Amino acid sequence: MKPKLSPIIFTPDNEPYLGRELLFHFDQLISSVMEQNSLTAPASHGHVLTDHQRMACQVIAQGISIALSIRELVRQGYLFGGHVLLRSLVERETILLYLHLHPEEIGRWNRGWHQGDAPSLSKMIDAIQSKLQHESPVRGKDLMSAMNSIMHAKPDSAPWNLVPLGENGVGHAVSKILNRPDLCDDLCANVIPTLVVIQAMMAAYFPDIKKPAQQIAQADAGHGADGATRRR
C-alpha cells in the first residue's frame, strides 16, 4: 500500500497543524487585528498626520503583513521560514512601543533610523523595560538570542529545521515541516503577544478611533477586512 501523499498546497480545511490551540488563538487575534485595522486605516486617509502617526502607518501595516505571512507559512508547513520572519515582526513591534514611550526619539526615525544613530533592537527592549519599570532579569540581547541565531544562520539555529528521518535519525528540512507541532506551537506563542502589542499601538497612535465590537476572545477566525494605511 502506497503511503498517502501530502497535498502540494494546503487549505484551511486540511492544513497540517489544524486544531492546535495556539494556532487557533493566532487566528482569533488576526480576526480582531484586521477588524481594528478596518477602523483605524481610514483615519490615516486624507488627514494631516503627526510624525509619529506617519511612522505608525508604515510600521503597523508592515507588522500586520508579516504576521499574515507567518500564518500562511504555518498553513503550508514552512515553519522555519516563519521563525525567520519572527525577528522582523518583533522589531516592528519594538519600534512602535519604543517610540510611543520615548516620543522625543522620533527625530531619529525622521533621519532614516540609520545604524549608529537609532538604538539597536536589544537596547530598545532594555529601554522599554526600564520605562515600564519592569525589573526583568533577562536583558534584551538575551531575549533576542534565539531569533538572531535563526536570522544569521548561527550553529545553535540547527534545531529549528530538524525533522525525524525514522531509522536514519534526523535531518535538516529544505521544504515543508509537517511533523513538528512543537515548532508550530513555539512560533504561535511568540507571534501572539507581539501582534497584541501591534494592535494596542493602533489605539495608542490613533486614540480617537473607537474599539471594534469584536474583541480578541470573541473573534471568529477568518473574518477580516482589507485596508492599507496611507501616508501623507
Indicate residue ranges for each PLM-predicted region.
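Short, hydrophobic, well-ordered secondary-structure elements
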Residues: 60-101
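Short, contiguous, well-structured surface segments enriched in hydrophobic/aromatic residues
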Residues: 32-73, 114
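Residue-level recognition of alpha-helical structural elements
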Residues: 52, 75-82, 105, 136
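Long, charged low-complexity segments
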Residues: 1-47, 108-232
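Short runs of predominantly hydrophobic/aromatic residues within well-ordered alpha helices
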Residues: 56, 82, 86, 140-144
